[in-house]
């Protein structure tokens, strides 16, 4: 299928208003956590569509409440500390990955964080602009630049989790 996008204002106008408060106070609100937990694919689980939702937190304290939530709703999820609020592993260092299947932490699929001093940094672009990022992603997709190990580990963790869900 093709990627789809729906503005949060159309999905839930009150949540959109709460998210907009960030631009007034300069901080994310609990509304950002609620928005991250929205999972449009869960509605298709009855039809056999399986997904492992990537749930990220910015502050370590949120890991506890999100763990409680994922257990309560019996989620299939990968919980991790995100990068700049996004649900992607830091390209410089692998964060801890906690995998939940049916709300239970799966130790065999979860991964410990990379600790200690970084001795080598991945070859990343010099800027953060859209054009620079797009060019870098194209290079990675073509294989002319390597995918950072931490992001490859996140992808592997998700594939292994989906395979575990699909197993009889």
Predicted regions and their residues:
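Glycine-rich anion-binding loops and their surrounding alpha/beta cores
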Residues: 1-168
């Amino acid at each position: 299928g093709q990627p789809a996008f729906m503005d949060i204002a159309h999905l839930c106008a009150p949540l959109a208003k709460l998210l907009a408060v960030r631009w007034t106070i300069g901080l994310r609100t609990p509304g950002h956590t609620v928005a991250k937990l929205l999972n449009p694919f869960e509605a298709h689980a009855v039809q056999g569509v399986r997904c492992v939702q990537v749930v990220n937190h910015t502050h370590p304290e949120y890991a506890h409440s999100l763990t409680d939530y994922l257990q309560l709703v019996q989620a299939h999820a990968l919980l991790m500390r995100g990068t700049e609020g996004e649900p992607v592993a830091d390209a410089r260092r692998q964060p801890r990955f906690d995998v939940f299947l049916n709300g239970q932490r799966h130790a065999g699929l979860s991964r410990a964080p990379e600790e200690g001093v970084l001795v080598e940094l991945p070859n990343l672009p010099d800027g953060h602009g859209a054009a620079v990022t797009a060019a870098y992603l194209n290079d990675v997709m073509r294989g002319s630049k390597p995918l950072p190990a931490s992001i490859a580990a996140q992808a592997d963790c998700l594939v292994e989790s989906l395979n575990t869900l699909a197993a009889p």
